[in-house]
């Protein structure tokens, strides 16, 4: 297996094995439901790829005709703990923690909820801390999987007895989502909004940044090419896929 032959030795600190030099960071990915965590190598080149792709997606905001007040707001990322585990030969943890560690000092003042709250592992406690801080922030973009972000906004609205999240964050104009299909959450999202906001889908995983939605009025994502990821495509037919849509062993 690839792990036993190659990846295991990279994790133990061996150089020039699966990638040139020594791989310092590994993202912990649960993979399929119920399976043990996998360590996904995160090279310095991958980190730069994530950063470049994020900037590319943010650069499309100018097409949304946003008010000037939006451009001095913060980005609130709702996710798992960013606390990293320092091992003898490497550092591992959630991808968000690895990327947080490499956030430019220029961007740090515009990101929320900050290092202390981001590092909290207890989800309920983290929500309580964000709810407490919410009135002090001017959030223009919220990012994260729908269930987490909507739950947070619902708790803020309920805690402060608001009509909508826009009563506390009037400059909230964009929601960047991913991880799951958004459509089942639209009705619930609309209940906490005071007005429509731009929705942008993204396909970001521990294995790489694969694509993002370029226009709010058009569904579908742009595949990110020339971005450090090798894509190989095969025809979607019965020769290559079984009746459940799973790739066959000898597909070509």
Predicted regions and their residues:
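Active-site diphosphate/adenylate-binding microenvironment
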Residues: 1-27, 37-41, 45, 49-50, ...
């Amino acid at each position: 297996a690839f792990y036993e032959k190659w990846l295991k030795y990279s994790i133990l600190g061996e150089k020039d094995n699966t990638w040139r030099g020594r791989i310092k960071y590994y993202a912990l990915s649960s993979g399929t439901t119920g399976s043990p965590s996998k360590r996904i190598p995160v090279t310095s080149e991958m980190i730069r790829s994530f950063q470049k792709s994020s900037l590319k997606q943010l650069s499309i905001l100018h097409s949304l005709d946003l008010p000037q007040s939006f451009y001095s707001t913060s980005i609130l990322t709702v996710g798992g703990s960013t606390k990293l585990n320092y091992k003898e030969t490497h550092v591992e943890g959630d991808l968000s923690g690895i990327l947080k560690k490499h956030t430019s000092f220029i961007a740090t003042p515009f990101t929320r909820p900050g290092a202390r709250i981001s590092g909290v592992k207890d989800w309920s406690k983290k929500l309580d801390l964000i709810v407490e801080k919410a009135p002090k922030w001017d959030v223009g973009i919220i990012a994260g999987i729908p269930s987490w972000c909507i739950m947070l906004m619902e708790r803020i609205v309920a805690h402060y007895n608001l009509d909508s999240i826009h009563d506390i964050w009037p400059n909230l104009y964009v929601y960047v989502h991913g991880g799951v299909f958004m459509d089942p959450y639209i009705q619930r999202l609309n209940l906490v909004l005071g007005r429509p906001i731009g929705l942008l889908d993204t396909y970001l995983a521990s294995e790489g940044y694969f694509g993002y939605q370029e226009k709010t009025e058009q569904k579908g994502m742009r595949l990110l090419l020339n971005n450090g990821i090798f894509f190989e495509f095969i025809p979607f037919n019965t020769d290559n896929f079984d009746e459940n849509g799973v790739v066959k062993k000898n597909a070509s």
